[in-house]
Amino acid sequence: MIFLIIFASTIIIEKTMRLLLISNSTNFGETYLAWACNQIEFFCLQNNLKKDSRIVFVPFAGVNIAGKAYPESYDAYEARVQKVFFEKFGFENFTSVHHFEDKVKAVKEADCIIVGGGNTFHLVAEMHKYGLMDAIRERALAGVPYIGWSAGSNVACPTLCTTNDMPIVQPASFKTLNLVPFQINPHYLDPHPEIDKMIKHGGETRQDRINEYLAVNQQMVVVGLREATSLWVTDGKMMLKGGKKMIVMQYGKEAVEIEPNTDVTFLLGGQQA
C-alpha cells in the first residue's frame, strides 16, 4: 500500500533527538507505569543515563493527583514517579521542576527531561508561563533524552489540538514543542457502536473528534496511539513499540493501520510507505 504523507509545515528532524513518546502511563488493573517500565529502562540504558544523572520532571499536567489540588498535587505526582524511577531503575537525582525558582536553568542543566500526563491544557499553560516550551525544545533538539506519556506525548507535537482533555485553563498559545511534524492522539480508542447503543450514548466518538480536527487542518497527520504503545525517535529514525497497532489518519484518505515494532520513520519527513 502506498500512503503519501503531506505536512502543513516542515520540521527538520535532528538526528541527535532522543524521544520516548508513550500513549499511557498505566494499563487497567496494573500498578503505575508497570507496562512501560521495560521500555523506559531500555531507553535510559540506551542513552547512557546513570544513577546520578540529573532527571527533571515536569508535573504541571497533574492538577488533581491523589485528590490534592495543585500545587500540592505536584508534590504527590513527583513522589509517585520518583518512587518508580528509584525502585525500578535506581535513579537518585530526580527532581520536579516546580521546586526550582529558575525553572529554565533547571531544564538547561538536565540530563533527561520527563513530562508526565494529566490535563494537557494546564500543562501547556504552565510551560508557556515559565518559558519551558522553548527551553525543553532546545534541549531535546540538542539530544537530551525526552520521555513523555499521555499529555507529555501530546506536547511533543506541533500543537495540543488532538488532546482528549477538557480546556480547564486557557494557555497563552496552543503551540507546543514541535519535535515531531504530526499530531498524536494518546489513549486512542476505537469506535464501539454496540457499546454506545447499549449505554444509549449519543455523543461523538474519538474518531469523530479527530475527523473534526482534520477537516479544519487538512494538511496535518494524526497518529492514534493505542494503550500500551509508544514511539521511539533515535538517530533520525522512529519505531512503533508495544503490542498493538497504530492508526494513521489524514484528511480525505483511508486510515492506515501499522503493525507494532515497525519502522515508521516516514512520518518524520513525508516519505512514502
Give the ranges of each region predicted by the language model.
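Short, Lys/Arg-enriched N-terminal segments with co-localized hydrophobic residues
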Residues: 2-16
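C-terminal and late-domain segments of enzyme folds
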Residues: 18-50, 60-62, 66-76, 162, ...
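Structural motif
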Residues: 21, 112-116, 147, 183-184
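A residue-level signal for conserved active-site and pocket-lining positions in enzyme catalytic cores
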Residues: 55, 113, 150, 184, ...
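Portal/gating segments that form or line small-molecule/metal binding sites
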Residues: 62-128
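Alpha-helix C-terminal capping/helix-to-coil transition sites in glycosyltransferase folds
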Residues: 108-109, 142, 179
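Catalytic nucleophile loop
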Residues: 114-117, 140-159
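Catalytic-core regions built around general acid/base machinery
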Residues: 130-143
